[in-house]
């Protein structure tokens, strides 16, 4: 839809003029030109008002009053009235409905020589420093080298600036960064000290660390192998002790203990204790050795292993079987056996002790006595030999008898007095009523 342009209304003294009806091609020419004003005579005083007017067809062509500016040569142009100039308004009517065409510019090209060779660079003088020589990274390397060569890591900044031939502010750039990451500290006004690590150490330290790492790896592998062996042995030992066929063999003999080479010419005491028994050995004195055993699970049994070579003429040697053994240990005993200064402690059904050399076969035992009629038992108390078989531990060697704290009976008891008995109403103290112990208690 085409709208008529707004016109300027003249004063009342002048006649009103309007634009003729024009087609769009006459109103909007394609050419661009500066507007031309038609000479006209108007009144000196007038006022303007903007309003929309109809365009009658009676106006003749070529009238330039109140017309929109167009090109020359028969085209309608806007004529300004004489006197006061109209207000300037910028109307961009040419760009309405038309695509914007960018302004054409000449492309810029690179200057290429005809021969295709680059222009030669101006050579620098021999004394001129390159950019790399004056870089802060290279200056830092030189500064750290001076710091490593200084005594105790203390460096004078004035001397460093003279040696490096740089301004002191560049040295401060380096020291500020190193101080910020806590590698140096300010010792005085112009002295700094290195507080980092691995600057003044042996240069062979990395190779030493690598060697130690390899040794540590080998030790870890060896430890892992030992753990596997211990686990395998523990499992095998558990199966061995839980087997019912092996429980009857859960004992150790005196000969087995005496056959150990480390126990020769030493006093050996075998200890049979329940699980979780606590053994304490205080600091050993010059000649004495003290051992403390404590158990909350049951009684502790202690056995003194005899030395067979000290008593060759013992009367009980023939009657003592060669396989005299300790009492079997309960099934709940846990594995463990410790020896300390001639002390053998047996806590386990099967003790890991080397097998001894079998002793020579003992002499044959005397034949069992034949059955005796009941009437012949009346004179049994008159026999010269003892009724009960005596064992080796009932005889004291001369060496032990001299230092023994036990008091022997004087005169010795007869055979009749060994046959004691108690009634249902008697206690253990009644056994000693038949013998006068007054003299022994006084002494």
UniProtKB/Swiss-Prot annotation:
InterPro entries: E2F (IPR015633), E2F-DP_heterodim (IPR037241), E2F_CC-MB (IPR032198), E2F_WHTH_DNA-bd_dom (IPR003316), WH-like_DNA-bd_sf (IPR036388), WH_DNA-bd_sf (IPR036390). Residues 157-178 are annotated as: Leucine-zipper. Keywords: Activator, Cell cycle, DNA-binding, Nucleus, Phosphoprotein, Transcription, Transcription regulation. It comes from the Eukaryota. It is found in: Nucleus. Residues 1-22, 306-341 are annotated as: Disordered. Residues 67-107 are annotated as: Cyclin A/CDK2 binding. Phosphorylated by CDK2 and cyclin A-CDK2 in the S-phase. Transmembrane segments: none annotated. The keyword Transcription applies. Residues 109-198 bind DNA. One of its GO terms (molecular function) is DNA-binding transcription factor activity. Residues 416-433 are annotated as: Retinoblastoma protein binding. Its main location: nucleus. GO terms for cellular component: nucleus; Rb-E2F complex; RNA polymerase II transcription regulator complex. Residues 361-443 are annotated as: Transactivation. The keyword Nucleotidyltransferase does not apply. Residues 199-291 are annotated as: Dimerization. A motif (DEF box) lies at residues 162-198. One of its GO terms (biological process) is lens fiber cell apoptotic process. SUPFAM superfamilies: E2F-DP heterodimerization region, Winged helix' DNA-binding domain. Component of the DRTF1/E2F transcription factor complex. Forms heterodimers with DP family members. The E2F2 complex binds specifically hypophosphorylated retinoblastoma protein RB1. During the cell cycle, RB1 becomes phosphorylated in mid-to-late G1 phase, detaches from the DRTF1/E2F complex, rendering E2F transcriptionally active. Viral oncoproteins, notably E1A, T-antigen and HPV E7, are capable of sequestering RB protein, thus releasing the active complex. Binds EAPP. Belongs to the E2F/DP family. Transcription activator that binds DNA cooperatively with DP proteins through the E2 recognition site, 5'-TTTC[CG]CGC-3' found in the promoter region of a number of genes whose products are involved in cell cycle regulation or in DNA replication. The DRTF1/E2F complex functions in the control of cell-cycle progression from g1 to s phase. E2F2 binds specifically to RB1 in a cell-cycle dependent manner. This is Transcription factor E2F2. It comes from Mus musculus.
């Amino acid at each position: 839809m085409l709208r008529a342009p707004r016109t300027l209304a003249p004063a009342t003294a002048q006649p009103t003029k309007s634009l003729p009806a024009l087609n769009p091609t006459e109103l909007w020419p394609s050419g661009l030109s500066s507007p031309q004003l038609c000479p006209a005579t108007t009144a000196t005083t007038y006022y303007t008002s903007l309003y929309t007017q109809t365009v009658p067809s009676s106006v003749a062509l070529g009238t330039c009053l109140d017309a929109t500016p167009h090109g020359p040569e028969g085209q309608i142009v806007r004529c300004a009235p004489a006197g006061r100039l109209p207000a300037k308004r910028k109307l961009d009517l040419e760009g309405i409905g038309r695509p914007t065409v960018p302004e054409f510019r000449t492309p810029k090209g690179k200057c290429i020589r005809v021969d295709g060779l680059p222009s030669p660079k101006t050579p620098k003088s021999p004394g001129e420093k390159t950019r790399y020589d004056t870089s802060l990274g290279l200056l830092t390397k030189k500064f750290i080298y001076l710091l490593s060569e200084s005594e105790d890591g203390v460096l004078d900044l004035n001397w460093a600036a003279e040696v490096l031939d740089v301004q002191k502010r560049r040295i401060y750039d380096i020291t500020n960064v190193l101080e910020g990451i806590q590698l140096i500290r300010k010792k005085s006004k112009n002295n700094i000290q290195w507080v980092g690590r691995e600057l003044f150490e042996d240069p062979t330290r990395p190779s030493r660390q690598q060697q130690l790492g390899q040794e540590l790896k080998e030790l870890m592998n060896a430890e892992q192998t030992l753990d596997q062996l211990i686990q395998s042995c523990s499992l095998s030992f558990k199966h061995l002790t839980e087997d019912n066929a092996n429980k009857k063999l859960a004992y150790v003999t005196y000969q087995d203990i005496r056959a150990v080479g480390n126990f020769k010419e030493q006093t050996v005491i075998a200890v049979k204790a329940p699980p979780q028994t606590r053994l304490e050995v205080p600091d050993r004195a010059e000649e004495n050795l003290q051992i403390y055993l404590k158990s909350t699970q049951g009684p502790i049994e202690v056995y003194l292993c005899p030395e067979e070579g000290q008593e060759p003429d013992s009367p009980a040697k023939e009657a003592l079987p060669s396989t005299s053994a300790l009492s079997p240990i309960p099934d709940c005993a846990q594995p463990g056996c410790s020896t300390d200064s001639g002390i053998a402690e047996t806590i386990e059904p099967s003790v890991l002790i080397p097998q001894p050399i079998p002793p020579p076969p003992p002499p044959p035992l005397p034949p069992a006595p034949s059955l005796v009629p009941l009437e012949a038992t009346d004179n049994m108390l008159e026999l010269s030999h003892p009724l009960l078989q005596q064992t080796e531990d009932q005889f004291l060697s001369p060496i032990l008898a001299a230092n023994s704290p036990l008091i022997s009976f004087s005169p010795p008891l007869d055979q009749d007095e060994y046959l004691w008995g108690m009634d249902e109403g008697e206690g253990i103290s009644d056994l000693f009523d038949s013998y006068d112990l007054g003299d022994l208690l006084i002494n």
